Amino acid sequence: MKITFISDTHTNMYDKRYKELMLPEGDILCFSGDLMTSGHNEGELIHFLKWFSKQPFKCKIFIAGNHDRYLENYPLLANDFISKFKNEGVVYLNNSSFEYKGIKFYGTPHQPYFCGWAFNVPDCEKLMHTYQQIPDDTDILLTHCPPFGILDKSHQPNYSNPTGEECLGSKELKKVLDEKTERNCQPKVVAFGHIHGDGGKKEKIGKTLYINASLCDEYYDPTNSIISIDF
């Protein structure tokens, strides 16, 4: 089974690069959030869905990210739009599971507080509780935020990260995944985005393959590598 992972396209309906971007054919396409740019209007969502549904995969799974405000603010309307693409293999996960040909997926968009964007959870205990809902039998976990210390560096200094080398992932997610590893029920793959600087990279730690699937680099150009695996 060939599975391709991407994230953080920040798809702009006026950007020709995305209209021309076609991914290599495979079985399953996983998208780890930030499908929108401003994230406020339905036009961006519809544009993404039209692009996503045309990709050459039988099954196309996506979650939201912090830029995807419309999906958080108008969930009923968003789900109505998404449902129209169900027959084209599009699946949206929001703290929910999905099984395809024996492979169990779970997706969560939630992440630590970041400037009050979408799906932010300021309360650490609530965020921990959210991640604790990840089923133990999950094969492939899709999150928007990386776990702390794993492919989560921006490599670009800014006011909140003076060296550009600080870890920016979620400590809560890392703790939950560590607990699962101790019980030998860790996911086989954890795919995420959010931090563009480590996009297009993968790292095997123990029995788990971690993938930062961000397609955009830190200048929001879609230059990071596309990652595919045989599962």
Map each language-model feature to its residues.
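Core dinuclear metal-dependent hydrolase active-site scaffold
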Residues: 1-18, 94-135, 216-229
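Active-site neighborhood of phospho(di)ester-bond hydrolases with catalytic His/Asp-centered motifs
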Residues: 5-7, 29-34, 60-66, 93-94, ...
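Core catalytic region of metal-dependent phosphoesterases/phosphodiesterases
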Residues: 6, 11-100, 167-169
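Short glycine-/acidic-enriched loop or helix-start segments at secondary-structure transitions
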Residues: 15-16, 40-41, 72-74, 104, ...
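Short, conserved loop/helix-junction motifs that constitute active-site signature segments
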Residues: 21-24, 52-57, 84-87, 134-136, ...
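Active-site-proximal segments of metal-dependent phosphoesterases and phosphodiesterases across multiple
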Residues: 36, 44, 114-115, 137-186
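Short, electropositive alpha-helical surface patch
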Residues: 81-86, 159-160, 167-169, 204-216
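Binuclear metal-dependent phosphoesterase catalytic core
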Residues: 97-101, 172-185, 189, 196-231
